[in-house]
Structures are given as C-alpha cells and as structure tokens.
C-alpha cells in the first residue's frame, strides 16, 4: 500500500493481514480468493504481477536516507518512490531523479545502483527475471 489509512485483507485460509503505508508487503497467488476492506477512505496500492510460467519476481521495501548501494541482478528492475521526497539514482553513470509517487524501470542493466535521498524515503524494488526460454 502506497498511500491511505490502511487495508484489511482476509485470506481464504482465514488469516487476516493489515496493510498500511509502512512498507508491509502481502504476497499471494492471483488464484487465491481474498477479500479486502478499507480502514478509512481510499488507498493507493502497488501490485506486482507476473506470469509464473515465464517470470519470477520479488518485491522489497527499502528505507533510505542518505546514500545506499544496491546491486541490480534483475533483468527488469522497477524502483517505485513511495516517499514525499525525490530520490536520485545513479545507474552506471546515468543519473535519474525519481519524484515522489513516480518510478523508474531499468531493463538489462545489471550492476550497482547508487541511491541517494536527503530526507527519509521509502522505495519499493521489484526484481523480475525470465525463466528459461
């Protein structure tokens, strides 16, 4: 969940989860029956979905303030800035400024990413890799 007061999920096995804008991630298959109830008002969420036979994926929440180095080992990397401040990304010497509520898609560019934020930031990193073709 990127913005809003929260969301309650009821999984088909009876387990309940509450998502808020704190970086908590819910992982489930698309065929699982899940119901949701808003806590208070509308939300903005981020869903990362792939065809399991063709791709693998991982989603990570990363808290950032100052500088941090992240190794990109994915064929496709999505960086989503869920913070209220801009984040600077140096990908192989190419600088990208990701404004609040925006993302960056990096394709077939493995190697280190230098991340920088002057204020506390929350980034979501989605890593996608193709299964054997």
For each feature predicted by the language model, list its residue ranges:
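Jelly-roll (double-stranded beta-helix
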Residues: 1-133
